[in-house]
Amino acid sequence: MKYKAHDYQQYATDFIIGHPVSCLILDMGLGKTVITLTALWLLLFDYFEVRRILVIAPKRVAETTWPAEIKKWEHLYGMTFAVAMGTAGQRKEALLSGADVTIIGRDNVSWMTKNIFFDFDMVVIDELSSFKSPKAQRFKDLKKVRPMAKRVVGLTGTLGNLMDLWAEIGILDMGQRLGRYIGGYRDRFFLPDKRNREIIFSYKPREGAEEKIYELISDISISMKAVDYLDMPECISNRVTVSMSESEQVLYDRMADEMILEYGEGQDIDAVNAAALSNKLQQMANGAVYDESGNVRNIHDRKLDALEDLIESANGKPLLIAYWFKHDRERILKRFPARDINTKKDIEDWNEGKIPVALIHPASAGHGLNLQEGGSTIVWFSLTWSLELYQQLNARLYRQGQKHTVIIEHLVTEGTVDEDILRAIEKKDTTQNAMIEAVKARIGGMTDDGRSNDEGI
C-alpha cells in the first residue's frame, strides 16, 4: 500500500529524525507505528545513522501490529525484521539474525539483557508506560544497556502521572531532564500528602511543579490529539442507568457502611481496605460477587437485562462488550451467544463482521489492535478506574478508518460505585488534557514546540 503522509505525520517523522531522544505522545488512531517506521527507514537507508534497531512493545503488538505494518507499506521495502517471540531458542535466533529491526515483547526485555549481547544502536519503546515503575525489573535491566543506544524513541498515547514521568522520561534521556534519582525528583517537585506519623502514603505536586516538569521535557516531546488532526466520525457517549431493587440496594449499602457483608450460608465477604471494598462494590454493581471461598454469589441481573435490550435494538449490528471480572464474562456467555476476542483469528472474524456479540477484557485490548472495521458500538458492562485502559479500548473502534458514528454505551447501576468511576474518568481526562497541552506540538501557526531515594537512572 502506498503511504501518503498527513502533515502531522510528516512533522512527527521529522521530529524523530531531528532528535536523538524523542517522546511522541500521539493519540490513538494517528498512526504512530507508520510514523515511526518511516523515520526508521530513513535513518537506516538515507541518513545511515543507525545500523540495528530494537523495538520493545506489548506482546500482542509485537507479534502482530509491527510486523503487519512493515509488510503493509510500499515505502518500507528493503527493511528486514525479526520477531523475538516464542521459545528462548526462537527469541535468540531472532535477536542474532542481524535484521534491521528486531521486535521483542516487553516481558522478554530482562531475559534479553541477561542472555544476549546488546548490539542495537537505536531503541523504540512502544508503549512508554511499560517502563513507568523504577522498581520493575524490566526498567532496571533496560537502564543498564540504554547507554549503548545512541538513539531512543518513546511512544505513548498518554503520559503517566507526574510521579511516573521520572521513570518514563528517565529511561529515554538517562536522567538528564528530571534528575538521575527518584528521591531527588520527589524532593524537588513534590510534598508529602497522605501520611501518618511514620509512613508517607502519597505525594502531591508542589505549586508550579507541573508546569516546570512539562517545560523541562518539552524539547524532546511532542503531543497530538486525534480530534485536532483527523476527520473523525462522530463519537457519542451514552449512559444506560439501571436500578437495583430495594433489597438489593440494602445489601449494597450495608457493605459500603460496614465493610463486611454477611451474605448467606455463613460466608463473609470481607473488604479489608478501600481498594478491596471498591472491587467488591464494583462486582455487586455488575450483579455478582465472589465470596471469601471464591464462590460466585448472584445479586441481580439488572445489567444483563439492559444488555439484552441493547443487543435487541442493535438488530444484528455488532457489539463489542467490555467486561472486567471473570464472573461478568461467565454470566454474559450463559445468557447470550457471545464470543471472546483473544486470538488473531478472533480479530479477523470480528473485522469481517462474523461476530455479532463480542467480549473483550480492557487489559487485553490495548495498544495496536485494529477493530474499527468490524463494528462501531462499545458496551461497557463493567467500568474501569483506569483511564488508560478505558481510552485504549474505545480507540479500538474510534480511530482512523472508522466509517460510522461510534457509540459508547456505559451500563451504570444507580447509587453505586459505577457513578463514582464515571466521574473519576471525566476528572482524570481533564487533568490529562492539561498535561498534554503543556507539551503539545503546534503545526502551522503553532509553536514547535513503595519509596526509595536510591532509585536512579
Sequence positions of predicted segments:
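Conserved RecA-like P-loop NTPase helicase motor core
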Residues: G105, R329, P337-A424, K428
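Conserved Helicase C-terminal RecA-like lobe
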Residues: M1, G18, L30-G31, I35-F45, ...
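Conserved pre-motif I regulatory segment
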Residues: M1-I25
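Conserved helix-turn-beta segment of the N-terminal RecA-like "Helicase ATP-binding" lobe
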Residues: V61-G86, L172-G175
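Conserved Walker A/P-loop ATP-binding site and its immediately adjacent core
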Residues: I35, V50-K72, G160-D164, W324-F325
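Conserved helix/coil segment N-terminal to the catalytic DExD/H
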Residues: A88-F120
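Conserved P-loop NTPase motor "coupling/switch" region that bridges the ATPase
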Residues: R52, G78, S97, M122, ...
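Non-catalytic, charged low-complexity extensions flanking SF2 helicase motor domains
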Residues: T405-I407, L411-I457
